[in-house]
Amino acid sequence: MRHSPRKRFGQNFLQDKYIINEILRAINPLADDNMLEIGPGLGALTQPLLQKLNRLTAIEIDTDLQNYLTRLPVSQGKLNLIPADALTVDFCQFGPHLRVVGNLPYNISTPLLIYLLKFITCIDDMHFMLQKEVVERIAATHGTKAYGRLSVMLQYHCEVEYLFDVPPEAFEPKPKVDSAIVRLTPYRVSPFESVNTEKLENIVAKAFAMRRKTLTNNLKGIISLSQLNDLGIDGGKRPEQISVAEYVQLAKFISN
C-alpha cells in the first residue's frame, strides 16, 4: 500500500525485518494472549502478531490505515480494529491480563504513557518503541540528568527494562532521532508504599516544574523545610536528586 505518512500523527513506519523479529522475540506472544496494539500503521508488527495470536485488538486513528489493515488476509476473523485516538480509550474494557504493544508516535508518547497508568490494574505488560531519549528518561535513576517526572511515575508503577536501540534506518521515512524498545511490567507486589496516584503526580509535577531550583523552593506553600527534615528528605537537593521512594513519602505526607 502506498501511504504518505501523516505528520500530525507522527507517523514513521517500521520496515526492518531483523528489528521486527527482535521485537517479536522480546514480546514472545502466545496464541491465547490478550494482546492490544496501539498505532499498528502499515502492520509491520500486526501481521506477524496475527500469525501467532488467536485474536489481536488494535487501535488506529488514521482512516486510510484502518481500511488497509482490515483488508489484510491475515486480519480476517482475528483482528478487532478500534478506530479511535488511544488517548480517549478505556483500556480496561478489553479485559484483564492485557498485553499492550506499539510503535508509539513521538508526538503523543509521553501523554499516552501517563494516560495508560490509569489502567495499570488491567495490564500484564507493555512493550513500546519510543524515541531513545524518552526510554532513557523512563529508565533513568535519581541523580542523573535524564531523571524526571516520567521516570518517577513509571517506576512507581512498573519494573522498567531498557531492551535495545533501533536506528533511524529501520523506518520509512527515517526519523531524525534514534529509537529504543522498552518493557514495562506493572508490579505484582510493589516495592513502594501504596499512595494516591493523583497526589503523587501533582507533587512530582510541582517538584520538577523548575529543575534548577531546590525541592524546598519548588514545593513552597505545600511542605516546609522543617517538615522535609522530619521526613528525612534534604530540601536543599534538586528534584532529580530525590528518589522514587522519597517522592512516594512526600505524596503520602501530603495526603494525610
Curated annotation (Swiss-Prot):
Keyword RNA-binding on entry: yes
EC number: 2.1.1.182
Subcellular location: Cytoplasm
Disulfide bond sites: none
Keyword Glycosyltransferase: no
Root EC class: transferase
Catalytic reactions on record: adenosine(1518)/adenosine(1519) in 16S rRNA + 4 S-adenosyl-L-methionine = N(6)-dimethyladenosine(1518)/N(6)-dimethyladenosine(1519) in 16S rRNA + 4 S-adenosyl-L-homocysteine + 4 H(+)
GO CC annotation: cytosol
Keywords: Cytoplasm, Methyltransferase, RNA-binding, rRNA processing, S-adenosyl-L-methionine, Transferase
Family listed: Belongs to the class I-like SAM-binding methyltransferase superfamily. rRNA adenine N(6)-methyltransferase family. RsmA subfamily.
Known function: Specifically dimethylates two adjacent adenosines (A1518 and A1519) in the loop of a conserved hairpin near the 3'-end of 16S rRNA in the 30S particle. May play a critical role in biogenesis of 30S subunits.
Protein name: Ribosomal RNA small subunit methyltransferase A
Organism name: Legionella pneumophila (strain Corby)
